[in-house]
């Protein structure tokens, strides 16, 4: 079995990244990920959603990048069935999943900054379809084990995605929340893109609420595209 057999990737992204897929580092990622799928361990998101962030936002449509760390590793119960919270988009959860604390803080800050109504569900797919790439630096995780797939090597791949976008699309609005995401500043060409930073929205971090991050994103979007980004969900 090949990676794209169980984890579909759109033609647009396959063409955009085609030179990466035969490189040794990517073949090693593929090997390690497929081994993880075959193991008794449960891997999130489900493989069909591994590249959901890319599939919802084609490379030519990317206007904003909101970089996450790795997928949610927890589950929730629905009709006595255990389901993953992770669904392939950074910070986002499925329509029926409980809204995690970090996402609650994102919605609070969005409402405080722009007056956007706090939604009742945490599915951010609509943002992705409007040009916000909701990419996690690490694309998979083992159930109940945060950052457990760091060893797979996903960051080498996500770094290449970012660098290719930085070369191809100008200017982009790059949103980096927290110290781990902000390490990616080193990848961003100077004076070409708008970089917006803020503390991580986790309740364990301080300073996200009141940071004005969504005001900054909206101002940047107006500057580039002369209109507001639609944050409604």
Curated annotation (Swiss-Prot):
Function: Excises uracil residues from the DNA which can arise as a result of misincorporation of dUMP residues by DNA polymerase or due to deamination of cytosine.
Domain of life: Bacteria
Species this chain originates from: Helicobacter pylori (strain Shi470)
Swiss-Prot/TrEMBL keywords: Cytoplasm, DNA damage, DNA repair, Hydrolase
Family affiliation: Belongs to the uracil-DNA glycosylase (UDG) superfamily. UNG family.
Pfam family, one: UDG
InterPro entries: UDG_fam1, Ura-DNA_Glyclase_AS, Uracil-DNA_glycosylase-like, Uracil-DNA_glycosylase-like_sf
A cellular component annotation (GO) from this entry: cytoplasm
Annotated SMART domains: UDG (SM00986), UreE_C (SM00987)
Biological-process GO terms, alphabetical: base-excision repair, AP site formation via deaminated base removal
Listed name of the protein: Uracil-DNA glycosylase
Residue positions of the active site: 70
Single GO term (MF): uracil DNA N-glycosylase activity
């Amino acid at each position: 079995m090949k990676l794209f057999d169980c984890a579909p990737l759109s033609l647009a992204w396959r063409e955009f990244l085609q030179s990466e897929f035969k490189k040794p580092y990517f073949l090693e990622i593929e090997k390690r990920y497929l081994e993880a799928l075959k193991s008794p361990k449960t891997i999130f998101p489900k493989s069909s959603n591994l590249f959901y962030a890319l599939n919802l936002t084609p490379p030519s449509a990317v206007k904003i990048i909101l970089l996450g760390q790795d997928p949610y590793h927890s589950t929730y119960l629905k009709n006595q069935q255990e389901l993953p919270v992770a669904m392939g988009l950074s910070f986002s959860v499925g329509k029926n999943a409980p809204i995690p604390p970090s996402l609650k803080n994102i919605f609070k800050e969005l409402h405080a900054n722009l007056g956007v109504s706090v939604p009742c569900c945490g599915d951010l797919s609509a943002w992705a379809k409007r040009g916000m790439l909701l990419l996690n630096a690490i694309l998979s995780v083992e159930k109940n084990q945060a950052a457990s797939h760091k060893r797979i090597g996903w960051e080498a791949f996500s770094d290449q995605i970012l660098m290719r976008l930085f070369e191809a699309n100008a200017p982009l609005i790059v949103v980096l929340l927290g110290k781990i995401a902000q390490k990616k500043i080193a990848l961003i060409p100077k004076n070409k893109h708008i970089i917006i930073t803020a503390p991580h929205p986790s309740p364990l971090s301080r300073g996200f609420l009141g940071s004005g991050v969504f005001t900054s994103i909206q101002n940047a979007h107006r500057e580039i595209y002369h209109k507001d980004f639609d944050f409604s969900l």
